[in-house]
């Protein structure tokens, strides 16, 4: 009986989400936006602690669009993105997310997306 009560109370405590998992979900979400052609939303996923000049914002948007076009030319586009792994350093509020990009020509590429936690949200570095 006491054992059962211990199990009950241990299952009631609040579970804290794994920071690496959360960073991985965020990184995949940003790259999914890129696949959908939502370049502004993708660029908004970068940690920008200070307001950037409009000309720099425009350049980041152009770079994102050119990157997608280049992948279309070289690999028949990006088809999907998968999270392979994520390692978080909770002391420094950073994480490295390992993504797999699957291309239209059936090739796959692994990339690392460095992330930083800012006000309880994961942003790309």
Predicted regions and their residues:
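Sec-dependent bacterial lipoprotein signal peptides
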Residues: 1-10
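Stable alpha-helical elements in mature extracytoplasmic
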Residues: 23-27, 38, 42, 60-64
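Short, well-ordered alpha-helical segments enriched in acidic and aromatic residues
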Residues: 36-51
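Short beta-strand element of the conserved SAM-dependent methyltransferase core
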Residues: 1-2, 99-101, 115
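Short beta-strand edge/turn micro-motifs at domain boundaries
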Residues: 108-125
């Amino acid at each position: 009986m006491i054992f059962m009560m211990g199990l009950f109370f241990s299952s009631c405590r609040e579970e804290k989400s794994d920071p690496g998992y959360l960073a991985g979900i965020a990184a995949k979400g940003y790259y999914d936006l890129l696949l959908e052609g939502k370049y502004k939303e993708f660029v908004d996923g970068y940690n920008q602690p200070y307001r950037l000049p409009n000309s720099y914002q425009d350049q980041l948007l152009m770079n994102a669009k050119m990157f997608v076009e280049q992948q279309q030319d070289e690999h028949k586009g990006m088809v999907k993105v998968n999270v392979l792994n994520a390692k978080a350093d909770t002391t420094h509020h950073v994480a490295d997310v390992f993504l797999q990009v699957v291309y239209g020509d059936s090739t796959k590429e692994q990339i690392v997306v460095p992330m930083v936690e800012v006000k309880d949200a994961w942003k790309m570095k």
